[in-house]
Every structure is written in C-alpha cells, then in structure tokens.
Amino acid sequence: MVRNIMAKEFSRTRRIAQQLQQELAQVLQRDMKDPRIGFVTVNDVDVSRDLSYAKVFVTFFEEDKAVVQEKLNALISAAPYIRTLVAGRMKLRVMPELRFIYDSSLVEGMRMSNLVSQVINQDKAKQQQFGSEDASVEDEVLGDDVADDADETEGKD
C-alpha cells in the first residue's frame, strides 16, 4: 500500500512538472516583455515532492557567458512575476517557488556535434587528397601496363 501511494506521488509530481514546463514555456514566449531575457528554452522542470519549489532548467542560445548570466539574472529577478502568471494558468493549491538554473547541456551538445562534423569533414578532405594522389601514383607505377591489359581484354571479346 505504501509503495502504491509513493508511486502515485511521484507520478503526480512528474505530471505537475510536465505541465509546469509547458506553461512556463508559453509564459516566457508570449507574456514576458523583458528584452533582457530574449529567446529562452525551458529544457526541464524538477518539482520537489512537497511542491514547495521547482528547479527550472533553461537554455539561451548565447555563447558569451556574461550575456547568459545577465539573461539568467533577469529571469531570477522576474521569477515571482512569472510564478504569478503561471499560477493563474494552473489549478494548484500551492504554486512552487521557481528557481531558474542555466542548463548548458544543449549548447554543449551542439558544440560537440559541430566538432565531430568538423573532424569528419577534415577526414573526408584528407581521404580525397590522399586518395587522388594514390590514384596518380598507381597510374605512374603501372603506367601503360593497365592500358595494355585493357586493350588485350577488348580484343578477346
């Protein structure tokens, strides 16, 4: 019985976290007029079991750490206002306190993907460069023997 109650609590907090993530994304996109925040993505929301607070993981598509910190500070200062807006959209007795946390995993993943793509392109360029040189070396080494073999094969048909 205790196990079943705990499972329900966790599924409830998970459902609340998902709904909170959707509502936060809409509020930040449509209702926030603060130019300091700009374009923000809500990656994940982790709600405490007692619903007293929610960690909101956000990403900005900025690489400059000073700009990212400025945007995060703007979100943190606007957290009570954002909480009020979201509370009006959700049917909760207690609205969690919002704690915004910068999530660098998406930006870091994109950076790693770009690095992998660059290495692959460099390898392809080296293969083409050395591949064409290898072909010209083969032609020089084999010389006319290849052409003679081709002529002999044509005559047998």
From Swiss-Prot:
Swiss-Prot/TrEMBL keywords: Cytoplasm, Ribosome biogenesis
InterPro entries cross-referenced by the UniProt entry: KH_dom-like_a/b, RbfA, RbfA_dom_sf, Ribosome-bd_factorA_CS
Region Disordered, residue ranges: 127-157
A molecular function (GO) term: ribosomal small subunit binding
SUPFAM superfamilies: Ribosome-binding factor A, RbfA
Stored Gene3D superfamilies: 3.30.300.20
Biased composition (Acidic residues): 135-157
Pfam families linked to this entry: RBFA
Top-rank taxon: Bacteria
GO BP annotations, alphabetical order: maturation of SSU-rRNA
Predominant location category: cytoplasm
Recorded family membership: Belongs to the RbfA family.
Protein name stated in the entry: Ribosome-binding factor A
Organism: Shewanella baltica (strain OS155 / ATCC BAA-1091)
Gene: rbfA
